[in-house]
Amino acid sequence: MAETHPVDVHPPYLYPDYKSTRLRAPAQPLVRVAPSPLETAGPVFPKRFVGESEADLTTWGTSAPLGEKMVLVGRLLDEDGRPVPRALIEVWQANASGKYPHPVDDHDAPLDPNFLGKGQVLTDDEGRYRVVTVKPGAYPWQNHPFGWRPAHIHFSLFGNSYAQRLITQMFFPGDPLLAIDPIFQSVPEAGRKLLIADLDLEQGIECVALGYRWDLVVRGPRATPMGV
């Protein structure tokens, strides 16, 4: 039987079409450094570390935010398909107009006073998470002429130590901007589909919100691309 090798699904440090990588990609070979005990110890997140309301990004204001409300569910799994419980998941995103409430965001789009675009949730004992939000809008960026970022949600995952933080992005099915987005295209072809959520109407709320499902795998041949 021929030996098989796992397919690398993670983006390279340098992807010239994504201009920021030209500045931050390492110019020399990486040097492996053994982690210190402080980096590998803790945190252990208790069940009450995050309040339930922090996973609902639509309840920060005095009224509902503008945009297409959605419910996003999924599981955090290891390479053997086992759940990763009590992992801290942080999310952040633009509002429905494609605007971040950040001083460096100069996109000529309105802010939504009822939407801050950030939240967090702890996975349960089965590795499950649930986030309520609005679908983010696309927005222009100056990476290349006529550049627009597709709708996406940023994810940050914390394991059982601060040295185990992983960052990635989730995208939406059928978005035509994916084909011209250098960040998405920097991911090897085998990994791109792993970054796209599935429409799952049963997870939505009748006449209120669409449902999406997106599972994350932290290691192994089915790993979700990280560093996106």
Regions found by a protein language model. Give the residues of each.
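Beta-strand-dominated extracellular/periplasmic modules and repeats
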Residues: M1-V228
